[in-house]
């Protein structure tokens, strides 16, 4: 009989390399369901534990969702505390054991004796085996122990950090003879170095031949440096991260680490032996709960000897038998164990790396998904709450199609025969679907208009749903931004069809292509999860929710946002569905009714937020409903694709019931699809009855309903609408009544059994009324044959909440803009006023931890809801300004001694776990040093202070301040600067990373004990003196007064503290009080910072030498030196103890050095606001910026809350999650008013294709009546005019401004007049023309005709009854949110007009006479008509029909004129006008001539009419057969920019019309062209009298220098107006913003953020390039990012202007031309655009810029993210763009020809060397060639920087494939473009891709020329990206040759060919990331550092 094998499990320790183990188990998990299940369960448990850590601890681990994700922190070396290491090793070891157990299940039962050997952390996985008898139990137990293991790792980390927080290893190993000498070596070292007990090194692991020494890294380093024996020994540093096996350190609470779980009571296997590493015998335990504390004692405290463990282990094995040794994870202990077993004569069979034999599939369970948030807009309901009201009121919301969508009457044809006919004019519509807060979502108005309204509304909807869910990205494991996915259903392209009327805009793709909707959502919210756009017709949103459900269950994401929208914008689908017979002709959906005749189209927007149920419960979410199951199938056997199929629907119900584990009778309600079509309703009801409600199967009828009867069929959004209604029934506990019931029901045979009930009244739907857990089915099907079905269940019953112990709370409100902020506050105030019973704690929790926060903020603190109401009421309406706070600096001020009191932190100690843990932990450490206990001084207000020792006071103060630092850090507040007063400096040094917490407490305690032991209390004391600064200074300098005293503290200019003997201080107090000084003898036992302390200094110096001093991580302002201190040592602390406190000097230093400013936030760390008073005495800090952490007479939470509120309002990011984490069991998310969006209307009506297209136009300028209404209170009408109508187009084309066709003001006036006339006469133009005046016509947005698109102008007229005034607004339908023009048309009394004209005539007669006399005497100018219009052509180019002026007399100063006018006769017989625009212009444009026809005015400026205050020109008064005169004059201008003029029209001796208040604005002609959206036409060359400046820069021709061939043309300075450069640059900037974004000028305020109006990096470059072109001012490409608001930019522009004026005073205001031989050189056909990316353009030759040549895509945008490359702001960095970046198809030239153009661009910017050149990717190759040519021309090249591209080969591959778009895509060259653009089909992306292909094609023909040895750059740098773009396997399939032009091999970071071109002297660097990610955040930061270092090496 064979001898049974004995099993030994070997678990190494936590220092073993984890990555091989991790990779192995992850790979094997693909084939093992058991292992896959364990890995996920273990990670889930670890995530729960990590969620409880501090933010700093979480940051070291990083976000993770898998074992490999956890291990990433090891690869990235962020796991400096070893937490991820220890957890990863544990999980990997258990994973390997699972694989072994699958191969041999007997391993885990008790049938075979089993011995486990583990070292240190390896004991924990061994413990899991002790309590598991099979794989299932092992997975269960080990998953929990993974969490325990994490706690242990964190405890090790925390204990270690308390001693020393710096980097470095905590252990080294020693081999050989030195092992025996270690105890003596350590003892001598500790004594000689005065190492305090807590910092001593110790022997943790030992064997006869080697040992491991542990200790703080700095101590170990010093030990190895000073010990001769260790230097000679074989000692090696180990990867150890903390203190283990340390008996001298305080042990953590093992009970807390073990935790609570039923698994802990599991009995241990009797045949299983686990040896203790310290007792060398099996642990004596019966349950896990007994075993784990013993294991932890061995890990944390007890030394171990592995050799002895292994030797003893052999005694428990049967002698002579074979041993199966299972190495569970690679470990170095294997050698030692095998040696031991071999010595004991055991035969060892080593078992490693077993294959998985598991073949069976384990069902993971269907899972459940929680709906945690909802939002929606529906017909008649702007929110989910309003939807419920609509349902309960039985409202049916159909109505006639609103005219804003399209004119239904134009398309209605009940026969349906017309090409676009609709058979019904009804639908269910949203109110105001065009409203959108574009600024909130950083979208420009121009782009917003192109966006599908569904896309816009879904952005609102997602935001609102997130608020409802309380979801803040990054706030929990399930809310990790990398794991949030978006699923959107959409089935309509209406908006794209509508936009096609108006031509194609640059934003049309991302605005109307449906895939952009989920992409834009993820982009805005910064989510990295997958995005899905689903088009399944009516099943789109149901399918989207179904996909989201499955993704959550499959763990493809952790949170999902799902929903969709349906917006009706055109008649197309109405027509198509009408013709298909789908639509009801009589109105709404009549679900279940006998008169059902089709469905009614509806609109809706709906969004839900989903999480796995367990995650929702863990995150304290409000669960609205639970999705238990989902199924989807297709009706494959139906007779028609659009016809429902009963069997298929039945199978869908059956499948979802099976998946959910429910029976039909468990379902109480069905939310049906219910469209109201006979076939659909009948089939759906039949299938429901057959599966869910068969006869005699139910005790109560199954209730059914359908939302479509209320809201119509919202098509793609129908599924989400039904889901929201269904979820509301759970929330409300009620099924709403079905609309139309009880009407006559349809004939449904399946309902005859009475098992189904359609409710005509509300039905209770509570758990009590249903009698069981509520569950329902939600059904949805689509016209394409798909069936979707969900089972929903009520949410779990929430647990009862305990009361929140905090008496004070913070409530926050924030918004993106001031309007929204005020409305948010108003809504919250109203809510609280109406709901005063609201829990204050829940309100605080909801507004802080569960809301997204914006830049504009308000915060309120209080102890009751009424406090918050009062604060809100006082704050509401206050003008807080538009400024958005940045991130101000935070200064921590640490309190010194004397401010203590009993119970300083009692409230925090009682309920704040982090605070309490810090205090108790520090006390434990202090006790080990022999210091007295002190925690009661902090925690107990009743402590009698008279019995408290100095040591207790000092220790309690230091501990309190350290605990506050830790607490503030957890809350997200870390200082930028610290300053400590006296003893407060120790905690300040802890905050700065100079001292560890343990060292700080050791020093404070030692210092205090020395005081107590060496000095007599009460002999000396301290006296505080306050007075005027002058008086105090005089006292301090008076030797007689200061006799026997010394200044201990300089607290402020008017306050010092003296130290000395008490009798002398008493005398001094009496003397100074008599001199009116304020004096106070302080209650302190010693005279600190005085000579009394000299006695303790030697002892303190010795103690201080034993601690480690780190380098400050932040600024430390020393109150010893009064300056910033960067080096600290023991001597510093000795001086700090003895010398005076220089607080005044320290604060003064902060101010003078700019370390603090008026915005700095001061937070006092200590028991009270002592130092804040001193700071206020030294500075002018505002009260709200100076905050105490604690205050003696205030509850701790009150002062903490108040400080948090101030910090929050100032813009700091608060860790609200951590703030509430200890109290989560007391808090609930509550429903509050949703965000108040600052909306603007972006709706555009559809106008094409209706019947009105054939109707005769009303007039030439006003074509069609769209709608007219008279409601008794107001008359209104809407008209349209089509610009392309020939007569109107002719009028417009005859009116050109500066060569650009612009619609004249006369056309707008005529439109307004005719519209008012139409309303007054009822459209009867045969009636007499009423007397009408045009009042205050303003033109804000000119209209220019657009070719290739249907341009429609809309005219809106309103007149209140009993009013004479019509309000008229005119808009371009392509931009309906922008008012083109507006005016008032007033019905006038002719008698009043006559009287007015008489007065006017009296006023102008003398002026006319005087002007005629001047003309007769030759003073005034007389112009005939032709000359008049020639002069006017400076601005105006009129068609012949406008030229009515025959002669004009113009005053000498061009301020007045008199013209003779003959009105042109109509040339078009079809022309019909109330008042012809030709006539209006001819009669009035004389006033414009005075400005624009003046030959003395600069041709660079024009004067544009902006407003006409009043115009009265009656059509009946005028005739082309009468000669008229017009007199015009200008008022004096106040600013030379704005002008006002008047025109009076005379016939004979009477005024027959006038125009008063014609306003003009002066602007540069270039700005006009920008506003009108046209390129600036070339100006004719002018001769100049200025001296020419010859360019002498050499250029190269065929490698030779030439001084004449290529000259650099310097850009001319901008033309100066009255404000010089600033006016020009600022005005061009604003004009560019208006054009690019579509904003109105009035909307672009100084506070406007460029990002929020849609200015991205590409648009920024475009704007700055235009500024350069038009003004000559060159700004770097990051200018609009560095100065993110208009105000910031304007201030910087003014600063630059002042510098420019100071540098060039002689050229200010002059034109400078750069010429050669008197003529400007002709510009080359192709030029590179050179973009200043950083710094300022060099002003002299001593400053050398860096030129970066564009990559293969050709754009400068590639370099936009580079950080500053100059050590200061002295380096100009230029990006040289490709000459073909705008038209890449033209890039067909050779490499040499392209390089010549780059060279010319570099030369033009910098004519002479030395040069700095470089480039990324293809730009690196071009930069090489440019450098080669410059060197050949004799120039000096300081440096060449090539970024991540191989050198072009000297030996091209003859078999290389010809480049194609597919090939370069395959090799990854387009990856960067695809990452940048969400849609790679966008015009910008397509253009860059085409350029990339052109570049590759150019390179494919390149054979480079190497540089000769004597002509090479002085330094060459090559930078490589470490990661591959493609998976390694993908490279095997690449076409030959082309890949050589891209990535280096991942293992080859060397020359890659560059050494063949530039020689061997190349410096190589590597940066994290792949080829494309290194150019974006965060990897670009590291690249920036490399480039900065390279540039620094090249500076001369």
UniProtKB/Swiss-Prot annotation:
<feature type="active site" description="For beta-ketoacyl synthase activity">
    <location>
        <position position="538"/>
    </location>
</feature>
<feature type="region of interest" description="C-terminal hotdog fold">
    <location>
        <begin position="1416"/>
        <end position="1569"/>
    </location>
</feature>
<dbReference type="InterPro" id="IPR009081">
    <property type="entry name" value="PP-bd_ACP"/>
</dbReference>
<dbReference type="InterPro" id="IPR020841">
    <property type="entry name" value="PKS_Beta-ketoAc_synthase_dom"/>
</dbReference>
<feature type="domain" description="PKS/mFAS DH">
    <location>
        <begin position="1263"/>
        <end position="1569"/>
    </location>
</feature>
<feature type="active site" description="Proton acceptor; for dehydratase activity">
    <location>
        <position position="1295"/>
    </location>
</feature>
<dbReference type="InterPro" id="IPR014030">
    <property type="entry name" value="Ketoacyl_synth_N"/>
</dbReference>
<feature type="region of interest" description="Disordered">
    <location>
        <begin position="1573"/>
        <end position="1621"/>
    </location>
</feature>
<dbReference type="InterPro" id="IPR030918">
    <property type="entry name" value="PT_fungal_PKS"/>
</dbReference>
<dbReference type="InterPro" id="IPR049552">
    <property type="entry name" value="PKS_DH_N"/>
</dbReference>
<keyword id="KW-0808">Transferase</keyword>
<feature type="active site" description="Proton donor; for dehydratase activity">
    <location>
        <position position="1481"/>
    </location>
</feature>
<dbReference type="GO" id="GO:0016114">
    <property type="term" value="P:terpenoid biosynthetic process"/>
</dbReference>
<dbReference type="GO" id="GO:0031177">
    <property type="term" value="F:phosphopantetheine binding"/>
</dbReference>
<dbReference type="GO" id="GO:0004312">
    <property type="term" value="F:fatty acid synthase activity"/>
</dbReference>
<dbReference type="InterPro" id="IPR020806">
    <property type="entry name" value="PKS_PP-bd"/>
</dbReference>
<dbReference type="InterPro" id="IPR036736">
    <property type="entry name" value="ACP-like_sf"/>
</dbReference>
<feature type="region of interest" description="Malonyl-CoA:ACP transacylase (MAT) domain">
    <location>
        <begin position="891"/>
        <end position="1150"/>
    </location>
</feature>
<dbReference type="Pfam" id="PF16073">
    <property type="entry name" value="SAT"/>
</dbReference>
<dbReference type="InterPro" id="IPR020802">
    <property type="entry name" value="PKS_thioesterase"/>
</dbReference>
<keyword id="KW-0597">Phosphoprotein</keyword>
<dbReference type="Pfam" id="PF02801">
    <property type="entry name" value="Ketoacyl-synt_C"/>
</dbReference>
<dbReference type="Pfam" id="PF21089">
    <property type="entry name" value="PKS_DH_N"/>
</dbReference>
<keyword id="KW-0012">Acyltransferase</keyword>
<dbReference type="Pfam" id="PF00109">
    <property type="entry name" value="ketoacyl-synt"/>
</dbReference>
<keyword id="KW-0511">Multifunctional enzyme</keyword>
<dbReference type="Pfam" id="PF00975">
    <property type="entry name" value="Thioesterase"/>
</dbReference>
<dbReference type="InterPro" id="IPR014031">
    <property type="entry name" value="Ketoacyl_synth_C"/>
</dbReference>
<feature type="modified residue" description="O-(pantetheine 4'-phosphoryl)serine">
    <location>
        <position position="1657"/>
    </location>
</feature>
<dbReference type="InterPro" id="IPR016036">
    <property type="entry name" value="Malonyl_transacylase_ACP-bd"/>
</dbReference>
<feature type="active site" description="For beta-ketoacyl synthase activity">
    <location>
        <position position="673"/>
    </location>
</feature>
<dbReference type="InterPro" id="IPR029058">
    <property type="entry name" value="AB_hydrolase_fold"/>
</dbReference>
<dbReference type="InterPro" id="IPR014043">
    <property type="entry name" value="Acyl_transferase_dom"/>
</dbReference>
<comment type="pathway">
    <text>Secondary metabolite biosynthesis; terpenoid biosynthesis.</text>
</comment>
<feature type="active site" description="For beta-ketoacyl synthase activity">
    <location>
        <position position="713"/>
    </location>
</feature>
<keyword id="KW-0596">Phosphopantetheine</keyword>
<feature type="compositionally biased region" description="Polar residues">
    <location>
        <begin position="1594"/>
        <end position="1607"/>
    </location>
</feature>
<feature type="region of interest" description="Thioesterase (TE) domain">
    <location>
        <begin position="1725"/>
        <end position="1923"/>
    </location>
</feature>
<dbReference type="InterPro" id="IPR042104">
    <property type="entry name" value="PKS_dehydratase_sf"/>
</dbReference>
<feature type="active site" description="For acyl/malonyl transferase activity">
    <location>
        <position position="982"/>
    </location>
</feature>
<feature type="region of interest" description="Product template (PT) domain">
    <location>
        <begin position="1267"/>
        <end position="1568"/>
    </location>
</feature>
<protein>
    <recommendedName>
        <fullName>Non-reducing polyketide synthase atnG</fullName>
        <ecNumber>2.3.1.-</ecNumber>
    </recommendedName>
</protein>
